[in-house]
């Protein structure tokens, strides 16, 4: 599953990053802020840690797995904080260009303001759920190993929406509605669920806990999506 998740991230972000880098070189968009690079390095490090931890368990090096896993207690908070800093940074980049940029930039970016305000919903949702699910996983690491290993993957699946939404060749409901992103995230975890179900002949508690939190949160995002009150709330949150 770790390899599968890394593949999703690469397929989503590499072409998008190459396109935007070319735009920066052509002067068609602002340079990437340093905060974006920091977040990318932290997320990449987390995914590689997840892969390494999976390989350690698969090769019966559990004592090393436990020692290396301590890194998550540093990496996860750093990743969450970086995300909380990055979201308003990218928001202000678009909002500032739409309101104070050159006329051509204002014309191009103004239609993106409502979109970026809606995307802020997804970013907040992903950040909160990732932190909650990782917290559940780490709390269960000693007493409930089955919950721990599954919840680590289920937590990691939540921010995959950022990569999936960049796969413009996929059928999508965006930007009108976020429901397609949720469907693709469910599909991303489905191989693990099916394998688990076939092997153990039951639905593990980790999936029940995850769905009990994930689905209401997704419904709340869908409810707030593109509502006038949400747009005004987003602008107040961002201080504009």
Q: Which residues does each PLM region occupy?
A:
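Alpha-helical membrane insertion/targeting regions
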Residues: 1-240
């Amino acid at each position: 599953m770790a390899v599968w998740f890394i593949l999703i991230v690469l397929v989503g972000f590499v072409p998008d990053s190459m396109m935007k880098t070319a735009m920066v070189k052509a002067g068609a968009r602002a340079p990437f802020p340093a905060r974006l690079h920091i977040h990318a390095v932290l997320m990449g490090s987390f995914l590689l840690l997840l892969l390494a931890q999976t390989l350690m368990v698969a090769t019966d090096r559990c004592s090393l797995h436990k020692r290396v896993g301590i890194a998550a207690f540093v990496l996860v908070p750093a990743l969450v904080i970086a995300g909380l800093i990055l979201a308003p940074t990218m928001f202000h980049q678009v909002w500032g260009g739409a309101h104070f940029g050159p006329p051509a930039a204002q014309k191009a970016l103004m239609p993106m303001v409502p979109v970026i305000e809606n995307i802020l919903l997804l970013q907040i949702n992903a950040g909160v759920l990732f932190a909650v699910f990782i917290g559940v996983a780490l709390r269960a690491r000693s007493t409930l190993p089955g919950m721990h290993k599954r919840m680590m993957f289920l937590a990691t699946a939540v921010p995959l929406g950022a990569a999936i939404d960049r796969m413009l060749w996929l059928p999508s409901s965006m930007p009108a509605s976020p429901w397609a992103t949720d469907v693709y995230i469910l599909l991303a975890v489905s191989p693990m669920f099916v394998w688990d179900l076939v092997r153990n002949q039951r639905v593990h508690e980790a999936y029940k806990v995850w769905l009990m939190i994930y689905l209401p949160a997704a419904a709340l995002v869908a409810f707030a999506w593109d509502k006038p009150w949400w747009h005004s709330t987003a602008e107040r949150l961002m201080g504009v």
